[in-house]
Amino acid sequence: SRWTSTEAPLPTEKSATGKEMPSIESANRSSKKSRRTRHDQDKLMPGAGIEVFTSSDGFKIFVGRNADANERVTHKLARPNDFWLHAEGPGSHVVIRNPGRIKEPSQVALQEAASLAAYFSSARGATKANVRWTQVKHVRKPRKGPKGQVYLRRANTTLAEPVSPKVLFAPPKPTKHV
């Protein structure tokens, strides 16, 4: 399978032939543990460095504000069917929660999350920025890679205007009735 990197070339991997396989019991124990962890994900608090927004059409959006927060957003809070976004260059990892397991995010949620990804990146001062997006199951962390670095597969690109969350999610101004 082909992977593309957001920050570094794709490393080559050697096969693990000749390596001892863990016993079936230990494999079952580890799979039960990972299942339990997945069910507990809703209980995880976003924590320091993570901002949470709600799109206009009701989707939760998580934004990592530093390398540690990016790691937590992408690899701890996000589920495989959630949508992951990142603007070109250094910036925040953004995740759109996908509880209904839909194949593509709504255009509203995608554009709002892409605007946040562009705003919380080195493209903040630009008029438009390319933002790559995919499902979290297509995002991988390289072995021994620095925090926040990922490889993508099957990524799409959208163009977004960097918009501050204060502007993007501002309450509507009241209208005057005369």
Tell me what each language-model feature is:
Residues 1-93, 97-178:
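Extended, highly charged segments
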